[in-house]
C-alpha cells in the first residue's frame, strides 16, 4: 500500500508539477503552494517532518516520494494510533468506524490514493452527474491523479457512514469509508478510520504545523499538481458538495447528531481537515499528496461507494464536504487551491452539475455561509473559479500559514486579498475582497504573523494594540542591538538583547511601562502592565518565545495567544463557528470568523483606516492592520482605540452582524472576550442579534452558531445572537453573566458546540432555511422573553413553572435554586437570564427546534454540554471549575465526552467561577432545567444524562423532577431531564431524590450507612414501616401533607409520604419521580444513589439538604404535626414533595429562620445562613418542615435556595407556598421532613417514645402550639436529621425509622417537635441533647450540625425524651442522624431547646461530633460510639455526629451550644436554634458538611436527610458518578460555603459550598467519610 501510495505520490507530484506548468492558474496556485510550502518550511520543519509530526497527514502526499514514504510510514504508525485515539476521543462510541491503523494507512496507500480510490469512488461520484463531468473531463481523476478529490469524496461517502455515526462526521467520513458500513470502516482497507484520523489529525497538524498542510489538504483536492484533476475532481467534488449542500438534510441530521454527540466540533474540524487535506495543498504537492493519499484511501477504497453514499445521503456528503470546507483552514486551504488550481475545474464543475449549480446558487445565497464556511465551497460556486485564489485563502486563513496566505495570495493579486481575507475570503470569496495581504508582512513572519492573523486573529484581535503589533511584526526581525533611549549596547544574540531589555530597561522602569525604543510607533505611550511592554518589545527584538511544540513545526510567536491559536491548526480545533444561519464554517480564531462573516455574510466593512486621507475599509482588523502597515508604514499601526472606533462593528444590522460583530470585533474577537468586554456591547449585541435576526431574517441562526463557536472571540453580537437566536444561547450560559457575553462566549459551550453543532445547525438551517428562520424567530421571541428572564421563563415553563419559577423566583434563593451556585440562580433577579439560564433555555430550545441553527448547534452541543449546556465540553468544564459547583461533576457526564471543543469549553466554563448560571448547575440540575424548559416550551425533552440509564427510576426521576414542580410535570421528568440539566428546581425535589425517595426515601437519612438496596429494604421496614404504617396514615391525615407532596412529591397524602405510590400530585414531575422512586425503592434500587454519579447524588442531596438544613430548625417544630406530618413528610419523602412542604413550613413558621435557611443556599457561604439558622431555631416552625427537601418550606428563603436545587422552583417554592398554608408551618415542616421523616414520621408516630422509633416518638409526643413552634424548628432539624441519618447515622438510625434516616429522622424530629411543647424538651433534651451535645462539643465543624442537629434534637429531646433515647438505641444510624438533625432545629426552635436536654448529652454529642467525620459514619456503625449518658443521646450523638460531621455543623453547634444557658444540650439546642443560621455560616460545619456529603453519598438513601448537607457536596457527585471525588470537590466548595451557612441547616450551606468548597482537605475528609459511610453501611 505504501509503495502504491508512494508511487501515487510521485505520480501525483509529477502531475502536480505538470499541472502547475500547464496552467497559469495552476502556476498561481503553485506559487501559493510554494509560498505555503515555504511558509510551512519556514515556520515548521520541512514539510515531511511536519507531516510526520502529524501522522494523520498521511493522506497528504509528501512533497517528495521520500517524504511520502516517510509519511506513510510514520503516519501509519502514529496515524494509526492517533486515528484510533481520535476516533475514540471524538468518537466516544463509533463502533462502525473500523480500525484505522492498518486500513487507514494501507487503504489510503493501498487504494492508490488516486487510482484505486478514484475509480471506485469516481464511479460513485458519477452519481452526481454534475460532479462526474468534471471527473471525466479530467482524466487524472481516473488516472488516480485526482487523488485529492477522491479523498474529499470518500469523506462524502463517509458522510453516509457519518449518518451512522453522526457524532463523528469526520470519522464516519473517513473511518466509515464504507459509510454504509460504519463497522466496515475497517472493512475498507482504504482505512476509513485512518482517513478520518489522518484527515483530522492531519488537518489539525496541518493547521498547526503549517498552513501549507492546510493548503495541502486543500491541495489534496486542488493541489497545483492536481490542478487538472484538482480542477475537475475538486470541482466535481465540490460540485457534489454543493449539490449535497442543497440536500444536506441527511447529513445535516447526522451533523446535528454529531454535534449533539459533541463531536460536531471535531467533525467540523475533521471535515475541515479533510477538506484541507484534500483541497488545501496549493502549496506543497507532496503534502497534498499525502493528504490525498489519506483521503484517497477512503475515497479510493472500492468498498466506499460514492454513488451509494450520495444516493443514500447526498446531503450528508455535502455536509461533510461543506463541513470540511467549513473548517476555516480547510476552507481557506481549499479556497486557496480552489481559486488557483481549480479555477477552471471549479467553473466546469459548477456548470457541469445542474444540481451542483442549484446547490451552487444555494451556497452562494448562503454564500460563503456554507461554501465560505467550507473554504472550497465558494470554489464549488461558479464564482469560486473566478476568485479561486482568493477563496482558497479565505479558507486557508485558519489553516494556512501566514506565508501561505500572504505568499500564495501575494503571488496572485487575489491571493493578497485572500491572505487578508484568508478568513474573509473564506467568508466571502465572491466578494473578491483583495485584502491586501501584505505578503511582506505575512511573509516576513508567515508563521508568526500570517498564522497569527488568521488562527491568531483572535488573539491578535484580543490584544489589539499589542496584538496589532504582534500581527504587524511583519518581518522576521532578529535584533541584537539595543535601541532603547540612551542605550546602544550590542549583543551577540537576540536572547541576550531580550534579557538586557527585560532586566535593564523594562524591569528597571519600575512602574513606568513605556517603550523607549527609538522610532517606536507607540511614541512612548505607556502600557497598562509590564507584561504588555514585555510583549511589545518583541516587536523590536523579533523575539518569538512561544514556539510550536508540534513535531516538524517551526512556527514561533511573540504572543502566547497566537501560539494557542496556531496550535489549533495542529489540533484542528475550530471553536469559532460562523454565526450565520446556513453557514457551518468554523475557524480556529475569532478574527478569521469575523472576517468571514463580514466578508461573506455582510458587505459591511466596519474597520476603517483612520489614516487621514485614506478611505479604505476592511471587514476585519487584521486586514486593516495589514493595510495600514503596508500602505501607511509600520509606524501607522492601528491603535486599539481606532479599532474600537473601527470595530464599532455596531453592525447589528449587518447580516452577520452578530458574526460580523463577533468577528468584526474581530479585534475583539481576539478578545471577543476582551473586547466583547463591552458589556454594553453584550447588551447591544443581543439587540443587535435581534436586529441582525431581522436584518438577516434568512439566517437568524447564523448568528447563533457564532455565539458558541465564535462567541468567545467574537463577540458581543454572537452572544446576543445566541440569545436572539436560541432564545437562549449556550455562550450566554457560559459567560456566567448575560452582560458579559464576551466572557461567556469565551467559555461558552456553544463555541465548540457550534463547531460541531454549527455544522449540523448550518446544515439544518440550510436544509430548512425557512423553517429554521421561523424557529429562530420564535426562539428569538422566546429569548426576548427569557431575557426578560422571568417573564419568559414563566411562560415557557408554565407546565413546570415551579421549576422555572424557582429559578426565576429564587431571586433571593435563586442561587440556592441553582443549588450548585447560589449565584447560579437561573432566573434569579437578573433582568436577563443568567448565562446558565440562557444556556439551559437554549439547550432546551435547541432541543425544541433542532432544525434551527441554534437548535442544531445545541443538538451538537446538547449532549456534549449536558452540564453546561452552553459550553462546549471545554467551556463547560471551565464554567464548572470556575463555579466550583456540583455542576463540575456533570460537566463530563452531561457534555458529550466526545465533543472535543465541548469538553474543552466545558472545562473552561467550569473553571470560570464567574459563570454560576447553568454552568454552575450540576448536570442533573441542568437537565432538570432543560427538561422544564422543554416542557414549558413544548420542545423535545433534553438529552438524558449520560449516567441516567444506570440510575434507578427514582434517581432519574429525582434528577428529572429535581424541583419537580407540581405544576411542572416535565414529560420526561425521569429520563428526559438530564441529571446535569435539571435546573434548580429539580434540586428541591432532589431532596427526595436521594434517591429517589422510593426505597431511598425512607433510607435517605440512613442511606449513607445503608447502601441503596439495603437502605431501601431495611429503612423501609423500620422507617418505611414507620412511614408506611404510621406515615401513610399520618400523611393522609393532613391535606397539608398532600399539599406538600403535591408540590414536591407524589405523596401528597400521608399514605404517599414515603411511598409516593399514591401521589396526590400525579401531574407533577415530582410525583412521577416519587412514584418512580418508590418503585425503585421497592426494587431496592436505592443503590441508585450509590450508583448515581457523585454529582447526581450531590445534586439530589443538595436539593434535599437545602430543605433539611433550612427547615431543620422549624422542621422539628413542624414535627409537632409529625403525626400527620410524617405522612406529609412521607409525601415529601420525595425531594420535591418534601421541599414543597418545607417551603410552606418555612414560610409559615419562622420566616426569619426560613430566610436564614435560605441564605444557606448551596453556594452561599454568607453567615447570613447562620443567622437564618438562628432565626430558624427561633422560628422553629418555618424551618421545621423538611428543610432537607425544601429550603423554602422550612425557611422560606433557605428552602428556596436549596430547593432551587432540590425542590427548587416547583417543589421548593410552590411547596413553600402550598405547604405553608396547608401545614401551617410546623406541620408543613414535618411534611417536609417527611422525605426523611416520612418514615421517620411514622416511626415517630408509631413509636412515640420508642427509642428506635425516635421519629414516631417525637410524633407521638404531645404537640402544642409551642410544640408546633418547636416542631417547626424541630421539623427543620428533623429534616436535617433526615439528611443526617442519610449520612453516617443512616446505619445508626436511632429512631425507629432507620429505613429513611432523612424521612425517619425528619418525621421523628417532627414528631418530637410536635411534642416539643409537651415533651419536646424531654425528647429533645435526651435525643437532641445527645445528638446535639455530641455535635456541639464534638467538633467545630460538627458544631453547626450539632447546633442544628442539637437544636432539633433538643427540641425533640425535650419533647420525646424516650424517643431520643430510643432513637439512639435504635440501630439504624440514618434515622438517628436524621433525628439529630430534627432535634437540633426542634430543640433550638421548639422547647427552646428544652434545657431538659442534659448538658452531658450535648457534651457527649459534641465530643462524638468532634470525630464525626469519622465518628459520624462510625457512629452510625456504633450507635453508642461515644458512651453517652443517654443511649439515645449517644445514638443521636453518633447520628448527629455523623450527620454533622458530614455537615461539619457540630463543632459550631457545639460552640453555639456552649453559649446557651441551658444544659449543654439545652444550650447547644438553643445555640442551634438561635444560631442555626450561625451554624450555617460556620466554615467548620461546612467542612464537616463535606464529610457529611460524603457520608450521604455512601448512604445514597440518606441523601434526603443529607440533602441539605450532602446535596451541596454531593450534588456534583450525583452527576459525576464518582462519589468520593465529586463529593470531595463539591464538599470542598461546600467547605467554604459550609463555613458561612451551615448553622440552621449545615446541609444547605454545604450544598451551597459543595460547589465552592473552600476547604481543600475536604476531599480527603470526604474520602474518609465515604469510607466510613461504606463501613457503616456494611455494619448496618
UniProtKB/Swiss-Prot annotation:
Biased composition (Polar residues): 1-10, 58-78, 401-427, 908-918
Phosphoserine sites (modified residues): 664, 849, 865, 877, 907, 980, 1006
Outcome of substituting residue 864 to A: Loss of proteolytic processing
Segment forming the signal sequence: none
Compositional bias segments (type: Basic and acidic residues): 461-474, 632-648, 684-699
Keyword entries, A-Z: Acetylation, Activator, Cell projection, Cilium, Cytoplasm, Disease variant, DNA-binding, Isopeptide bond, Metal-binding, Methylation, Nucleus, Phosphoprotein, Repeat, Repressor, Transcription, Transcription regulation, Ubl conjugation, Zinc, Zinc-finger
Subcellular localization(s) per the UniProt record: Nucleus; Cytoplasm; Cell projection, Cilium
Compositionally biased tracts (Low complexity): 703-726, 863-882
Record-linked InterPro entries: GLI-like, Znf-C2H2_ZIC1-5/GLI1-3-like, Znf_C2H2_sf, Znf_C2H2_type
Residues with the N-acetylmethionine modification: 1
Residue numbers spanned by region Mediates interaction with DZIP1: 745-845
Source organism superkingdom: Eukaryota
ZnF endpoints (C2H2-type): 480-505, 513-540, 546-570, 576-601, 607-632
Disease: Greig cephalo-poly-syndactyly syndrome: Autosomal dominant disorder affecting limb and craniofacial development. It is characterized by pre- and postaxial polydactyly, syndactyly of fingers and toes, macrocephaly and hypertelorism. Pallister-Hall syndrome: An autosomal dominant disorder characterized by a wide range of clinical manifestations. Clinical features include hypothalamic hamartoma, pituitary dysfunction, central or postaxial polydactyly, and syndactyly. Malformations are frequent in the viscera, e.g. anal atresia, bifid uvula, congenital heart malformations, pulmonary or renal dysplasia.
Quaternary structure, from the entry: The full-length GLI3 form (GLI3FL) interacts with SUFU and this interaction regulates the formation of either repressor or activator forms of GLI3. Its association with SUFU is regulated by Hh signaling and dissociation of the SUFU-GLI3 interaction requires the presence of the ciliary motor KIF3A. Interacts with KIF7. The activator form of GLI3 (GLI3A) but not the repressor form (GLI3R) can interact with TRPS1. The phosphorylated form interacts with BTRC. Interacts with ZIC1. Interacts with ZIC3 (via C2H2-type domains 3, 4 and 5); the interaction enhances its transcriptional activity.
Protein name: Transcriptional activator GLI3
Gene: GLI3
Amino acid at each position: 500500500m505504501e509503495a502504491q501510495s508512494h508511487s501515487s505520490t510521485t505520480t501525483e507530484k509529477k502531475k502536480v508539477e505538470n499541472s502547475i506548468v500547464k496552467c497559469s492558474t495552476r502556476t498561481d496556485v503553485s506559487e501559493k503552494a510554494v509560498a505555503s510550502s515555504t511558509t510551512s518550511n519556514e515556520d515548521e520543519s520541512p514539510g515531511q517532518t511536519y507531516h510526520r509530526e502529524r501522522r494523520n497527514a498521511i493522506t497528504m502526499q509528501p512533497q517528495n516520494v521520500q517524504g511520502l514514504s516517510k509519511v506513510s510510514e510514520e503516519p501509519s504508525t502514529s496515524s494509526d494510533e492517533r486515528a484510533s485515539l481520535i476516533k475514540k476521543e471524538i468518537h466516544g462510541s463509533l463502533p462502525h468506524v473500523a480500525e484505522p491503523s492498518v486500513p487507514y494507512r494501507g487503504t489510503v496507500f493501498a487504494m492508490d490514493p488516486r487510482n484505486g480510490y478514484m475509480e471506485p469512488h469516481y464511479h460513485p461520484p458519477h452519481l452526481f452527474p454534475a460532479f462526474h463531468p468534471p471527473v471525466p473531463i479530467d482524466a487524472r481523476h481516473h488516472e488516480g491523479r485526482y487523488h485529492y478529490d477522491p479523498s474529499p469524496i470518500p469523506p462524502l461517502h463517509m458522510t453516509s457512514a457519518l449518518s451512522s455515526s453522526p457524532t463523528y462526521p469526520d470519522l464516519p467520513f473517513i473511518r466509515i469509508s464504507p459509510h454504509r458500513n460504519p463497522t466496515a470502516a475497517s472493512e475498507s482497507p482504504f482505512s476509513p478510520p485512518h482517513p478520518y484520523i489522518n484527515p483530522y489529525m492531519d488537518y489539525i497538524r496541518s493547521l498547526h504545523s503549517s498552513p501549507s498542510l492546510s493548503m495541502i489538504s486543500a491541495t489534496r483536492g486542488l493541489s497545483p499538481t492536481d490542478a487538472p484533476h484538482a480542477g475537475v475532481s475538486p470541482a466535481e467534488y465540490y460540485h457534489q458538495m454543493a449539490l449535497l449542500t442543497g440536500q444536506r438534510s441527511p447529513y445535516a441530521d447526522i451533523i446535528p447528531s454529531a454535534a449533539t454527540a459533541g463531536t460536531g466540533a471535531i467533525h467540523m474540524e475533521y471535515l475541515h481537515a479533510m477538506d484541507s487535506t484534500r483541497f488545501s495543498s496549493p502549496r506543497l504537492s507532496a503534502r497534498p499528496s499525502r493528504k490525498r493519499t489519506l483521503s484517497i484511501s477512503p475515497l479510493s477504497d472500492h468498498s466506499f461507494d460514492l454513488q451509494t453514499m450520495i444516493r443514500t445521503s447526498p446531503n450528508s456528503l455535502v455536509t461533510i464536504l461543506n463541513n470540511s470546507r467549513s473548517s476555516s483552514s480547510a476552507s481557506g486551504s481549499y479556497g486557496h487551491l480552489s481559486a488557483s488550481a481549480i479555477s477552471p475545474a471549479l467553473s466546469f464543475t459548477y456548470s457541469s452539475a445542474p444540481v451542483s449549480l442549484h446547490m451552487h446558487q444555494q451556497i452562494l445565497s448562503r454564500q460563503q455561509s456554507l461554501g465560505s464556511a467550507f473554504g472550497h465551497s465558494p470554489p464549488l460556486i461558479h464564482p469560486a473559479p473566478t476568485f479561486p485564489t482568493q477563496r482558497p485563502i479565505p479558507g486557508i486563513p485558519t489553516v494556512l500559514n501566514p506565508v501561505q496566505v500572504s505568499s500564495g495570495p501575494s503571488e496572485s493579486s487575489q491571493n493578497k486579498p485572500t491572505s487578508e481575507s484568508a478568513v474573509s475570503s473564506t467568508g466571502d470569496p465572491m466578494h473578491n475582497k483583495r485584502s491586501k495581504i501584505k505578503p511582506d508582512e505575512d511573509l516576513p513572519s508567515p508563521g508568526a504573523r500570517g498564522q497569527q492573523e488568521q488562527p491568531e486573529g483572535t488573539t491578535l484581535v484580543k490584544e489589539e494594540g499589542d496584538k496589532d503589533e504582534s500581527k504587524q511584526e511583519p518581518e522576521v526581525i532578529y535584533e541584537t542591538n539595543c535601541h532603547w533611549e540612551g542605550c546602544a549596547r550590542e549583543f551577540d544574540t537576540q536572547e541576550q538583547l531580550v534579557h538586557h531589555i527585560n532586566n535593564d530597561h523594562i524591569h528597571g522602569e519600575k512602574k513606568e511601562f513605556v517603550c523607549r525604543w527609538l522610532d517606536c510607533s507607540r511614541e512612548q505611550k505607556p502600557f497598562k502592565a509590564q507584561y504588555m511592554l514585555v510583549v511589545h518589545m518583541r516587536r523590536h527584538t523579533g523575539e518569538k518565545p512561544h514556539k510550536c511544540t508540534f513535531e516538524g513545526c517551526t512556527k514561533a510567536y511573540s504572543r502566547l495567544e497566537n501560539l494557542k491559536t496556531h496550535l489549533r491548526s495542529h489540533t484542528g480545533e475550530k471553536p469559532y463557528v460562523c454565526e450565520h444561519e446556513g453557514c457551518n464554517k468554523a475557524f480556529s480564531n475569532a478574527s478569521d470568523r469575523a472576517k468571514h462573516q463580514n466578508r461573506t455574510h455582510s458587505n459591511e466593512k466596519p474597520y476603517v483606516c483612520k489614516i487621514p486621507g485614506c478611505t479604505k475599509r476592511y471587514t476585519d482588523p487584521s486586514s486593516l492592520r495589514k493595510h495600514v502597515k503596508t500602505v501607511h508604514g509600520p509606524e501607522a499601526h492601528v491603535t486599539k482605540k481606532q479599532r474600537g472606533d473601527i470595530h464599532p462593528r455596531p453592525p447589528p444590522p449587518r447580516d452577520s452582524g452578530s458574526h460580523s460583530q463577533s468577528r468584526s470585533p474581530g479585534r475583539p474577537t481576539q478578545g471577543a472576550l476582551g473586547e466583547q468586554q463591552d458589556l454594553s456591547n453584550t447588551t447591544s449585541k443581543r439587540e443587535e442579534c435581534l436586529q441582525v435576526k431581522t436584518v438577516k431574517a434568512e439566517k437568524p441562526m447564523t448568528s447563533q452558531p457564532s455565539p458558541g463557536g465564535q462567541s468567545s472571540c467574537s463577540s458581543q453580537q454572537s452572544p446576543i445572537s445566541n440569545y436572539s437566536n436560541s432564545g437562549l444561547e449556550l455562550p450566554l450560559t457560559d459567560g456566567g453573566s448575560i452582560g458579559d457575553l464576551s466572557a461567556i462566549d469565551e467559555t461558552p459551550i456553544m463555541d465548540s458546540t457550534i463547531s460541531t453543532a454549527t455544522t449540523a445547525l448550518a446544515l439544518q438551517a440550510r436544509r430548512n432555511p425557512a423553517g429554521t428562520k421561523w424557529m429562530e424567530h420564535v426562539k428569538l421571541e422566546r429569548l426576548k422573553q427569557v431575557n426578560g428572564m422571568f417573564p419568559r421563563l414563566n411562560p415557557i415553563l408554565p407546565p413546570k413553572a415551579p421549576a422555572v419559577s424557582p429559578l426565576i423566583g429564587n431571586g433571593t434563593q435563586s442561587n440556592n435554586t441553582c443549588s450548585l451556585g447560589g449565584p447560579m440562580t437561573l432566573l434569579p433577579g437578573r433582568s436577563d437570564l443568567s448565562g446558565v439560564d440562557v444556556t439551559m433555555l437554549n439547550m432546551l430550545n435547541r432541543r425544541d427546534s433542532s432544525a434551527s441553527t441554534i437548535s442544531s448547534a445545541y443538538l451538537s452541543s446538547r449532549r456534549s454540554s449536558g452540564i453546561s449546556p452552553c459550553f462546549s465540553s471545554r467551556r463547560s468544564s471551565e464554567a464548572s471549575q470556575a463555579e466550583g459547583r456540583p455542576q463540575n461533576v456533570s460537566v463530563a457526564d452531561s457534555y458529550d465526552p466526545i465533543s472535543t471543543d465541548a469538553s474543552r469549553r466545558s472545562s473552561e466554563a467550569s473553571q470560570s467561577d464567574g459563570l454560576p448560571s447553568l454552568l454552575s448547575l450540576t448536570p442533573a440540575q441542568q437537565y432538570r432545567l432543560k427538561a422544564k424548559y422543554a416542557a414549558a416550551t413544548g420542545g423535545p425533552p433534553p438529552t438524558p444524562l449520560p449516567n441516567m440509564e444506570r440510575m434507578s427510576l427514582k434517581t432519574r426521576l429525582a434528577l428529572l423532577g429535581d424541583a419537580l414542580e407540581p405544576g411542572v410535570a416535565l414529560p420526561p421528568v425521569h429520563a428526559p431531564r438530564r441529571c446535569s440539566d435539571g435546573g434548580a428546581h429539580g434540586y428541591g425535589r432532589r431532596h427526595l431524590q436521594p434517591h429517589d425517595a422510593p426505597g431511598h426515601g425512607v433510607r435517605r437519612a440512613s442511606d449513607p450507612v445503608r447502601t441503596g438496596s439495603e437502605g431501601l429494604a431495611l429503612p423501609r421496614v423500620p422507617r418505611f414501616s414507620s412511614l408506611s404504617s404510621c406515615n401513610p396514615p399520618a400523611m393522609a391525615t393532613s391535606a397539608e401533607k398532600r399539599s406538600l407532596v403535591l408540590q414536591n412529591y407524589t405523596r401528597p397524602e400521608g399514605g404517599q409520604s414515603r411511598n409516593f405510590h399514591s401521589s396526590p400530585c400525579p401531574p407533577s414531575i415530582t410525583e412521577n419521580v416519587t412514584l418512580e422512586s418508590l418503585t425503585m425503592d421497592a426494587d431496592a434500587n436505592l443503590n441508585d444513589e450509590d450508583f448515581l454519579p457523585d454529582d447526581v447524588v450531590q445534586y439530589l442531596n443538595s436539593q434535599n439538604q437545602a430543605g433539611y438544613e433550612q427547615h431543620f430548625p422549624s422542621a422539628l417544630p413542624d414535627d409537632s404535626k409529625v403525626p400527620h406530618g410524617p405522612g406529609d413528610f412521607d409525601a415529601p419523602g420525595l425531594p420535591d414533595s418534601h421541599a414543597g412542604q418545607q417551603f410552606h413550613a418555612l414560610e409559615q413558621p419562622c420566616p426569619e429562620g426560613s430566610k436564614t435557611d435560605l441564605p444557606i443556599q448551596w453556594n452561599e457561604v454568607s453567615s447570613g445562613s447562620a443567622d437564618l439558622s438562628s432565626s430558624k431555631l427561633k422560628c422553629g416552625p418555618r424551618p421545621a418542615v423538611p428543610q432537607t427537601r425544601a429550603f423554602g418550606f422550612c425557611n422560606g428563603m433557605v428552602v428556596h435556595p436549596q430547593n432551587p436545587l432540590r425542590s427548587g422552583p416547583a417543589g421548593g417554592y410552590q411547596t413553600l407556598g402550598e405547604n405553608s398554608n396547608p401545614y401551617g408551618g410546623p406541620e408543613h415542616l414535618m411534611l417536609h421532613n417527611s422525605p426523611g421523616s416520612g418514615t421517620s414520621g411514622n416511626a415517630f408516630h408509631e413509636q412515640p417514645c420508642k427509642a428506635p422509633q425516635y421519629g414516631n416518638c417525637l410524633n407521638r409526643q404531645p404537640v402544642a402550639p409551642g410544640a408546633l413552634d418547636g416542631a417547626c424548628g424541630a421539623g427543620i432539624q428533623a429534616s436535617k436529621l433526615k439528611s443526617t441519618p442519610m449520612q453516617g447515622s443512616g446505619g445508626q438510625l436511632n429512631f425507629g425509622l432507620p429505613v429513611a434516616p432523612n424521612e425517619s429522622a425528619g418525621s421523628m424530629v417532627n414528631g418530637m417537635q410536635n411534642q416539643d411543647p409537651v415533651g419536646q424538651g424531654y425528647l429533645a433534651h435526651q435525643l437532641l441533647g445527645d445528638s446535639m451535645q455530641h455535635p456541639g462539643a464534638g467538633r467545630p465543624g460538627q458544631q453547626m450540625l450539632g447546633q442544628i442537629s442539637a437544636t432539633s434534637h433538643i427540641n425533640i429531646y425535650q419533647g420525646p425524651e424516650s424517643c431520643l433515647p430510643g432513637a439512639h438505641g435504635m440501630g439504624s444510624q440514618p434515622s438517628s442522624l436524621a433525628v439529630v438533625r430534627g432535634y437540633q432545629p426542634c430543640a433550638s426552635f421548639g422547647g427552646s431547646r428544652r434545657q431538659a436536654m442534659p448538658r452531658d448529652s450535648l457534651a457527649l454529642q459534641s465530643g462524638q461530633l468532634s470525630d464525626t467525620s469519622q465518628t459520624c459514619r462510625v457512629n452510625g456503625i456504633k450507635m453508642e460510639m461515644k458512651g453517652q449518658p443517654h443511649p439515645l443521646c449517644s445514638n443521636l450523638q453518633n447520628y448527629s455526629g455523623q450527620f454533622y460531621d458530614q455537615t461539619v455543623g457540630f463543632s459550631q453547634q457545639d460552640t453555639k451550644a456552649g453559649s446557651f444557658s441551658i444544659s449543654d444540650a439545652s444550650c447547644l439546642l438553643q445555640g442551634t436554634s438561635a444560631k442555626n443560621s450561625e451554624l450555617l455560616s460556620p466554615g467548620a460545619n461546612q467542612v464537616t458538611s463535606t464529610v457529611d456529603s460524603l457520608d450521604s453519598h455512601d448512604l445514597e438513601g440518606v441523601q434526603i436527610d443529607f440533602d441539605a448537607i450532602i446535596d451541596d457536596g454531593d450534588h456534583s457527585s450525583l452527576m459525576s458518578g464518582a462519589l468520593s471525588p465529586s463529593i470531595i470537590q463539591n464538599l470542598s466548595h461546600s467547605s467554604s460555603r459550609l463555613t458561612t451557612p451551615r448553622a440552621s441547616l449545615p446541609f444547605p450551606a454545604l450544598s451551597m459550598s459543595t460547589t465552592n468548597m473552600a476547604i481543600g482537605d475536604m476531599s480527603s475528609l470526604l474520602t474518609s467519610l465515604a469510607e466510613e459511610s461504606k463501613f457503616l453501611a456494611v455494619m448496618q
